[in-house]
Amino acid sequence: MKQFMLVKTFDALFAELSDKARTRPAGSGTVAALDAGVHGIGKKILEEAGEVWLAAEHEGDEALAEEISQLLYWTQVLMVSRGLTLDDVYRKL
């Protein structure tokens, strides 16, 4: 029997993060990050961007994909924090 991996899309992640920002579940790391503000989120983005670069230079594709996923997460947290929507970004692509 084939097993299927559940895949979270960029849009689904954004919806999940937006929901957490709205409902503020106790113990949520996303809520804690939002409460840390733009400065704290920005520091995480810089950290993750560096880790993406290092993974691209020195690690395999699996590690690189994981680091990119973390950078995308933090970028979306910043978007939610600033009130940007996916459409705001899509218009710039």
Curated annotation (Swiss-Prot):
Protein name, per record: Phosphoribosyl-ATP pyrophosphatase
Record localization: Cytoplasm
GN (gene name): hisE
Top EC class for this record: hydrolase
Pfam families: PRA-PH
Alphabetic keyword roster: Amino-acid biosynthesis, ATP-binding, Cytoplasm, Histidine biosynthesis, Hydrolase, Nucleotide-binding
Annotated organism of origin: Mycolicibacterium smegmatis (strain ATCC 700084 / mc(2)155) (Mycobacterium smegmatis)
Pathway linked to the protein: Amino-acid biosynthesis; L-histidine biosynthesis; L-histidine from 5-phospho-alpha-D-ribose 1-diphosphate: step 2/9
InterPro entries for this protein: HisE, PRib-ATP_PPHydrolase-like
Signal sequence region: none
EC number from the UniProt entry: 3.6.1.31
GO terms, biological process: L-histidine biosynthetic process
Family note: Belongs to the PRA-PH family.
Source organism phylogeny: Bacteria, Bacillati, Actinomycetota, Actinomycetes, Mycobacteriales
